[in-house]
């Protein structure tokens, strides 16, 4: 039997999961390469044999996506599998055209081929775009379940930017664990808000192994929470699917892959940030939910912002630092830091571009929609150095940190700074407390010691 030669087109996340679940032990296929994009410096590596399995004793090479047409011809590729997220339909089909023009088939794997089934109840928190507020939603879900005396284990969508073997299964229980695993800023932004609240987070590369460890976590496990990445759908089959939408990008819920998959398969659709969006934009999003997911429960929510030192913003010339991926491939022009600056009466939000150095100059050149805000890029040591130098070069009176982590703990900032925190605050009913109360009863998770609370 002739095996089909496969290239998996990815960005160090969904691509590895698709391989592990669908291709690793499938003798009908030979995965000859991965390609990589979106994340700096991940091409030129190898998916190691220890993870690739017995059919791949040499491992699998990772190339830049730019080389795709040549690779298809040189490696006699039959099919290319698209496996990354937060990308417009136009760009997905452009990749498809490149693949077809080189002679290969173009393929997308769906949930039935890639989702793992847990022996614990699973709640997934996903989104239609990156930067919609998944993390604050996940925190709200966890905190609500904890009030019912339930043990919740969060499992985060992968961000394996380092040693893949060492990152096969990662467990984070303390901030020190983040240092132990040499986490990038992007990883810390997702893990730290959980562990700072005393919650356990798992992540890594092999999600079958991760799920098995999470289910038997030494601290106990009643519920698995899938904490999604970008706008990808869950790696685990959910018993309750929650999808977050952003009225600052109305219409994107029907235009970006695979966010529309999340929307069409969701049980609960949360329209976040309604306090900072126009009524017209909120209505567009609500109409699209009713069109694509008519049976889902719609919840509207504010992204409630609190500032540690508001006096450092009012009347000051400020530099705003925001979450990197939200601004870059998420295509946002602002975030919580910008909203805080506007609400608290900053004298001026400065343009950071004249002060940018190194890799940040490249980021601004690539993502030209980013203007009066600095993306916190920190995938590697050089980017961290460039971020620190850019902030310290800036002609401003204060720095607003709108990232989920405390940047001043990671880099040295030579100006007064203040952090912005943001939390999900639902408006009216139904809300997450109502939804989760039903979930707890349905899965017979009620404990005698639980205290039931009602918010809003």
Model-derived features with residue positions:
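Short, flexible coil/linker segments at domain boundaries that flank nucleotide/cofactor-interacting
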Residues: 1, 117-118, 313-315
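A solvent-exposed beta-alpha-beta segment
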Residues: 2-75, 348-361
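Flexible phosphate-sensing "switch/lid" loops adjacent to ATP/NTP-binding sites
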Residues: 5, 75, 124, 136, ...
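Residues at the beta-strand->loop junction immediately N-terminal to the Walker
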Residues: 9, 126-127
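Phosphate-bearing ligand-interacting subdomains
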Residues: 49-112, 384, 393-406, 411
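Phosphate-binding P-loop
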Residues: 114-122
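Conserved glycine(s) of the Walker
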Residues: 132-133
């Amino acid at each position: 039997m002739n095996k089909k030669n496969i290239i998996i087109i990815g960005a160090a996340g969904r691509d590895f999961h698709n391989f592990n679940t669908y291709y690793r032990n499938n003798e009908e296929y030979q995965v000859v390469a991965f390609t990589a994009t979106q994340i700096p410096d991940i091409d030129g590596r190898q998916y190691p044999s220890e993870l690739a399995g017995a059919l791949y004793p040499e491992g699998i090479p990772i190339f830049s996506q730019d080389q795709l047409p040549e690779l298809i011809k040189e490696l006699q590729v039959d099919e290319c599998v698209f496996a990354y997220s937060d990308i417009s339909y136009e760009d997905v089909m452009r990749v498809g055209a490149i693949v077809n023009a080189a002679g290969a088939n173009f393929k997308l794997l769906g949930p039935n081929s890639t989702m793992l089934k847990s022996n614990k109840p699973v709640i997934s928190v996903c989104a239609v775009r990156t930067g919609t507020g998944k993390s604050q939603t996940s925190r709200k879900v966890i905190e609500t379940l904890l009030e019912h005396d339930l043990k919740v284990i969060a499992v985060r969508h992968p961000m394996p930017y380092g040693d893949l073997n060492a990152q096969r299964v990662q467990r984070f229980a303390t901030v020190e664990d983040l240092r132990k695993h040499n986490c990038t800023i992007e990883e810390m932004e997702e893990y730290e808000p959980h562990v700072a609240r005393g919650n356990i987070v798992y992540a890594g590369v092999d999600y079958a192994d991760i799920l098995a460890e999470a289910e038997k976590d030494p601290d106990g496990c009643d519920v698995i929470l899938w904490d999604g990445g970008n706008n990808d759908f869950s790696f685990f089959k959910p018993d309750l699917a929650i999808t977050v939408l952003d009225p600052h990008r109305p219409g994107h819920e029907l235009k970006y892959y695979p966010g529309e998959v999340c929307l069409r398969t969701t049980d609960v659709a949360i329209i976040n940030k309604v306090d900072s969006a126009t009524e017209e934009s909120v209505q567009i999003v609500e109409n699209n939910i009713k069109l694509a997911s008519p049976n889902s429960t719609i919840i509207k929510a504010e992204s409630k912002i609190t500032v540690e030192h508001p006096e450092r913003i009012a009347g000051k010339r400020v530099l705003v630092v925001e979450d990197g991926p939200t601004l870059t491939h998420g295509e946002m022009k602002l975030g919580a830091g910008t909203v805080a600056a506007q609400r608290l009466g900053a004298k001026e939000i400065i343009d950071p571009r004249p002060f940018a150095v190194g890799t940040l100059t490249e980021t601004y050149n690539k993502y030209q929609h980013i203007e009066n805000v600095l993306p916190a890029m920190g995938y590697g040591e050089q980017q961290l150095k460039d971020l620190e130098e850019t902030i310290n070069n800036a002609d401003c009176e204060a720095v607003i940190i709108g990232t989920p982590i405390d940047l001043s703990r990671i880099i040295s900032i030579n100006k007064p700074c203040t952090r912005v925190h943001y939390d999900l605050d639902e408006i009216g009913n139904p809300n997450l407390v109502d939804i989760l109360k039903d979930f707890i009863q349905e899965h017979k998770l009620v404990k005698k010691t639980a205290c039931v609370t009602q918010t809003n």
